[in-house]
């Protein structure tokens, strides 16, 4: 297996994560990842200044680029590497997780993107390996998940295939072949935040590659640190990205029903802003 320290470059997009970012960098170093670039998407000087002493390259664009554009900027600043690891700043990568993902890619040559098992701080599993949603499936899942956790829509949405492949993995942490990342042009920068990982995995699959989850690789995601600063902005961005993905991928009857889907999503956004504007946001 390739040596992690020479084969993996990592990009972390920071938005006021504070001490959590330091913990993330420590866990990367524990996994022998040393080629690390942090992109400061928050206010100038908001990223902990001690990162320089940890051999981390800091990219300071002077503005919030959005997540996908930030990763693209960071990837361009990394040193040579066969694989690109994308990680949220509020993430702790368990020992051996990066090596497990590298090993999977080296033994599954048709797979271009892998995601780890993501745990919440309480140890519960976050469903980070999913099928591509449409507004109808995602809507049914969002409405039924709380009162009926095992409803058909949620089971379909969160079920990996028997061979371990999935449609997409969470953007909180994933490993992608650098050559494929460059082949598809990186993240679609029209997505400011939310659904950008779905769009990336869609492009990966459109180019003939597959996506998979690696249960042996485990990370813990604190979650929500960036979103707590501007919940209303995040809610709006979430819905805009969901609509963009539907417009990008809908075919046949789904495309004919786009006006209806747009209306439904608009009503859902209105309710989210007026009824529960401070509710936590998870990917639908």
Task: Describe the predicted segments one by one.
Residues 1-27:
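N-proximal low-complexity "stem/linker" segments adjacent to membrane-targeting elements
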Residues 92-127:
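Conserved donor NDP-sugar-binding/catalytic core segment of glycosyltransferases
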Residues 161-162, 167-218:
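A short, conserved alpha-helix in the catalytic core of glycosyltransferases
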Residues 26-35:
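Short, acidic, metal-binding catalytic loop of nucleotide-sugar glycosyltransferases
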Residues 81-92:
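Short beta-strand-to-loop acidic/aromatic patch adjacent to the donor-nucleotide binding site
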Residues 202-279:
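Active-site-adjacent helix/loop segment of glycosyltransferases
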Residues 133-166:
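Short, flexible, basic/aromatic active-site loop/helix in glycosyltransferases
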Residues 60-79:
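Glycine-rich, basic loop-to-helix element that forms the pyrophosphate-binding segment
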């Amino acid at each position: 297996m390739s040596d992690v320290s020479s084969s993996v470059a990592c990009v972390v997009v920071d938005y006021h994560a504070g001490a959590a970012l330091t913990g993330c960098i420590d866990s990367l170093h524990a996994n022998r990842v040393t080629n690390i670039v942090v992109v400061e998407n928050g206010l100038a000087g908001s990223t902990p200044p001690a990162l320089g002493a940890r051999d981390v390259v800091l990219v300071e664009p002077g503005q919030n680029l959005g997540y996908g554009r930030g990763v693209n900027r960071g990837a361009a600043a990394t040193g040579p590497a066969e694989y690109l690891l994308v990680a949220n700043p509020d993430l702790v990568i368990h020992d051996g997780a990066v090596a497990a993902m590298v090993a999977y890619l080296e033994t599954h040559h048709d797979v271009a993107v892998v995601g780890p098992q993501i745990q919440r701080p309480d140890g519960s599993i976050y469903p980070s390996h999913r099928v591509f949603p449409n507004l109808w499936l995602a809507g049914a899942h969002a409405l039924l998940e709380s009162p009926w956790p095992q409803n058909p829509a949620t089971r379909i949405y969160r079920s990996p295939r028997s061979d371990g492949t999935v449609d997409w993995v969470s953007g909180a942490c994933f490993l992608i072949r650098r050559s494929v990342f460059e082949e598809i042009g990186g993240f679609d920068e029209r997505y400011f935040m939310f659904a950008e990982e779905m769009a990336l995995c869609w492009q990966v699959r459109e180019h003939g590659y597959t996506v998979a989850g690696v249960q042996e690789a485990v990370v813990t995601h604190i979650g929500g640190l960036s979103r707590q600063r501007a919940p209303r902005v995040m809610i709006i961005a979430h819905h805009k990205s969901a609509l963009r993905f539907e417009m990008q991928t809908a075919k046949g009857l789904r495309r004919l029903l786009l006006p209806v889907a747009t209306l439904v999503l608009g009503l859902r956004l209105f309710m989210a802003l007026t009824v529960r504007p401070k509710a936590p946001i998870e990917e639908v």
